[in-house]
């Protein structure tokens, strides 16, 4: 627990533009949406401005969040808040994935 009494163990918020959107349904009927999000911003560090860029896969699962993805297409600007975890890829490498718990379409 932090001194501020906030419980923030694994939380990430990211704004970016969608590069790809793929919807699917698991064999047990759970709907999923996988988005590649590209983030670009300027951040101040040690008194200097630096370019911050990343591409991150976003995993959206379950009916409550899936309906919020209906308006999201390639090029949409969105805010995603959730937790990060590592997924093992088919090539054996691990990749960080942001699992969405909140999504907002910004444009």
From Swiss-Prot:
Gene3D superfamilies: Nucleic acid-binding proteins. PROSITE patterns: SSB (PS50935). It comes from the Bacteria. Belongs to the PriB family. Keywords: DNA replication, DNA-binding, Primosome. Residues 8-107 form the SSB domain. InterPro entries: NA-bd_OB-fold, Primosome_PriB/ssb, Prisomal_replication_PriB. It comes from Actinobacillus succinogenes (strain ATCC 55618 / DSM 22257 / CCUG 43843 / 130Z). This is Replication restart protein PriB. GO terms for cellular component: primosome complex. GO terms for biological process: DNA replication, synthesis of primer. Involved in the restart of stalled replication forks, which reloads the replicative helicase on sites other than the origin of replication; the PriA-PriB pathway is the major replication restart pathway. During primosome assembly it facilitates complex formation between PriA and DnaT on DNA; stabilizes PriA on DNA. Stimulates the DNA unwinding activity of PriA helicase. The gene is priB. It holds the Pfam family SSB_1. Homodimer. Interacts with PriA and DnaT. Component of the replication restart primosome. Primosome assembly occurs via a 'hand-off' mechanism. PriA binds to replication forks, subsequently PriB then DnaT bind; DnaT then displaces ssDNA to generate the helicase loading substrate. One of its GO terms (molecular function) is single-stranded DNA binding.
């Amino acid at each position: 627990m932090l001194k501020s009494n906030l419980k923030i163990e694994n939380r990430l918020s990211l704004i970016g533009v969608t590069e790809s959107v793929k919807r699917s349904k698991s064999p047990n009927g759970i709907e999923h949406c996988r988005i590649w999000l590209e983030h670009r911003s300027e951040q101040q560090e040690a008194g200097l401005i630096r370019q911050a860029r990343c591409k991150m896969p976003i995993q959206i699962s379950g009916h409550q969040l899936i309906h919020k993805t209906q308006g999201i297409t390639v090029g949409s600007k969105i805010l995603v808040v959730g937790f990060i975890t590592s997924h093992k890829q088919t090539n054996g490498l691990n990749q960080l994935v942001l699992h969405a718990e909140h999504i907002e379409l910004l444009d």
